[in-house]
Amino acid sequence: VVNIPPDLGVVLDVSPPPLRGLNIYGVLRFDRKDLELSADWIMVHGRLEVGTPQEPFRQRAVITLTGNNPEEDQMGMGTKVLGVMGGVLELHGEPRRGWTKLAQSTPRGAREIAVLEASGWRVGDRIVLASTDYDPRQAEVRTIVAISGNTLTLDRPLDFPHFGEVTFGVDQRGEVGLLSRNVVVQGDEASAGSGFGGHIMAMMGSVMRISGVELRRMGQRNRLARYPVHWHLVGEARGQYIKHSSIHESFNRCITIHATSGLEVVGNVAYDAVGHCYFLEDGAETQNLLEGNLGILTRRPEASQGEQPVIPTDKNPATFWITHPANIVRNNVAAGSDGVGFWYALPENPTGPSATTTIWPRRTPLGEFSGNVAHSSWDGLMVDRGPNRDTLEPETTVYNPRTYPADTQNQYNDAVNPPVVAEFKNFTAYKHRGNAIWLRGLNHKVVGARLADNAIGVTFASRATTLEDSLIVGDSANKGFPRNWEFRGADGRSLPRPWASGAGPIQDNFPIRGFEFYDGKVGFRNVEFVNFQPLEIHNAQGAYRTVREAGALSYLRFTSFDIDSRNFAQGARFTNAKAVYLPPRPEPTPEELSKGQSADGYRGSVFIDLDGSVSGRRGHAVVLNHPFLLDTSCEVRPEWNAGVCGHGYARLHIRSESGENIGPVSLTREDGGRPVFRMWGAPNNPRFFGATVIKGRAYTLEASGGLPRRLRLRLEDSEPGDFIHLALPYSGEPYIYRDYWIDNSNRLAQAASRAEFEASSGDRYWSEGGWLYLKLRVKNEVGRDWAVLDVCSSDLCR
C-alpha cells in the first residue's frame, strides 16, 4: 500500500507495478504521457488529477481496479474502488463528440454506415448502434476500420438493420454512441466473469469532476452502493459533474446520484448496464441537470447469470430513474430497455438514508422534462408505480403537483393549495411494446409529443390531464426486423406483441391504439393521427393468419375500474386512420371474474366529441356499441364497434356503505327494449359498482345479493339540473338522506303523489307496490356536478 502524505505533491511519470492500495492525502498528478495505474483500491483524501477542465489529458491513461476480495471494506466503500473521501477527483480526457445519429437507414449485413456527424472519431474507435426496433438487444458494437467524411467502415457486417429516417414526422434516426476514450477507468479482466467490477464513489465533502472518460467493467453485481460512478450523500454539489463520458459493460447501473443536488450529468453514453441506469436514488435529489445523455440496452437482472435486483424495481429497469420531479431532464435518449425509458418513480417521502417527512415528491412541481426521446423498450415515459417507503416495491402513485407540497391537509384543495400543471414537452417515443406514455395523477399536460409504432400511444390514468399539439403514428416506414419465431405484418413489419398465446389465438391481434381514454376527466386537443388501419399478420411460415386491429382512439382495454363520462376529444385530424376502435367485450366469464376482470368500466366506454372532429357530430358522444348505451337515435358505426349519440351521459355509482356484498347488480333502462347492464364491481369488490347512464332516463336497479342496510347512490359527471330516475325493490320504511348530510332535517319526505315526485327537485321519493322510486338530481349550484342519496333501513343510517 502506497501512501502519499498531505504535504507532498507527486507527478506520476512512469507506470508503476500493480499496487495493493493507494492512499492519496496529498496530490497525485498524471504527467502528460501514456500511463497505466493498477491497484486493488485507490482512496483520495487529497487530490487525484488526470488532466484539468482547462487542459484535458490528451495522452492515454488507464486506471485498473483489481481488488478481488468482496469482504474487504475500505472506509465503507468496499474494494476495487476509486474512492473520494473528502478529497478532489479530477478526470478529464480529450473532448470528443459522444454520440450522433444515422444519416440514412442501414440494411442488415452492411459494413458501412452514414452518420450525421463523425468529426473527431477515429479508426480503431469502438462504437455502438442502438436498436431501432422493439427488441433492445438489436443494439450492436463495432470497431471503425475506415472513415471517409461522415461514412464509417466497420470491422464486420451488421446483424440487424438500423433505421435512419424521419418517418411521417417522427424522428427515428438511430443513435450511434462512441465508447472509446483516451482516459479509462476499468475493472480488471476478471471482472467480466465474476461481475465484481470497479467503482467510483464520492462521499460527503468530496469534489468529483469527470469528463471525457471511459468506464468499463464497472459496478459490482447484486451489491448496493457499488455503481460505476456514484455521488453518495454528498449534499450540495454545484460545480461537480460527469460529462461526455462513456460507461459500458456495467454490472450494476451507470450513474448514481444519491442524496446529492446540483450535479450536471451531460452528454454521456451508457451501454449494456444491469438495473436502472441513470439513477436518482432516494427521492431527495433535486436541482440536478441531466441533459443530452444516451442510454442503450438497460437490462433486467438475469438469475441464470447470477444477477439479482438490488432494489425490487430493477426487475423492470429504467434507463432514467427519477425519484424527485424537481430536476431538469432535457434532450436525453433512452434507446432500449427491458423496462422503461424514463420512469418518474416518486416515493411519498424520500427513502433510505434520506428518509424524512418534510419532502413530498408526489406533490412537488415538475422541474423540466423536455426534448427527450425513448424507443425500443416496453414503456417510454412512466409517471406511476413509485417505490413504497418500506418495501421499495412499486405501488400505485398519484403525481399531484401543488404550490405547497408539504400541505397534506389541502393536497386536493385547489383554492388553498393551487395545482401546478406539470408539462411534459416535446417527447418523442417509438417502438414500445406497451405505452409510449403512461401518466397517473392530476394536472398534467403533454405538449408537442411525436409518437410512432407503439402498442399504445398515450394512456392517462389521471384527471385534469391533456395531450396537446401532438402527432401519433400507428405504423411508420420503420418496419423493423422480426425474428424468425415472431409473428409479423403481411408487409413484413415487426409487431409490438409478436408472440402467440398458449390458448391459440395470437396475442398480436391486440389492437394498436393512439390515444387511450381511461379514468378522467382527460382528453386531447389538436392531435394528428396517422396510419391506424387493420393489418393482416401471420407467423413466419405464413400458416396462421389473422388481423391486428387498430384505432386512433380507444379505451383502456377491458378495464374494470371506473371512468369519466366527460372524457373528451377536440381538434382531431386523421390521415389513413380509423378514428375509433373499441374491441367487443361480452359479459365476463367465471374465469375472468376469478381474476377480477369484470370489465365494468370498459363496457361503459364513452367520450365527448367536442367539436365534431372525430365523428362529424359536434358535441355528440361516442359510446361502445352496447344496447344499454344506445337508442334508435344513435348512429352505429360497425367498423368502430361504437355508436355516435346526441345524448348527455353521466356516471352512476352504487355502493354498499354498510359492507354487505350485493353483487352482481343490474340496471335496466326503462325505455325501448329495456336493455340491461350487469356489473360485478371494481376488481374483487362486490360492494362498489359503476355504470354509464343517459341523463334524464329512468332505470331499475336490482342486486342479486339483496340491498344493503345502507345504500349510497351517486350521480356524477353532470351539471346542475341533470337527473335520472331510479327504481329499486324495497320493503319497509326507507330513511333517505341527500348529498351526504345525514340528519333528520335533511331526510327526504314521501311525495303526496307520483306526479309530485316526478316534478320534484330531487327532495321527494315515491313508494308503491314494493318499489322505491328515487330522483337523483344535481342541485342548481354553480360548480356542482354530482348528486347523492343515502338509502338506509334505519333512522340516521345507524
Regions found by a protein language model. Give the residues of each.
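A generic structural motif
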Residues: R111-L116, I144-H162, E768-R777
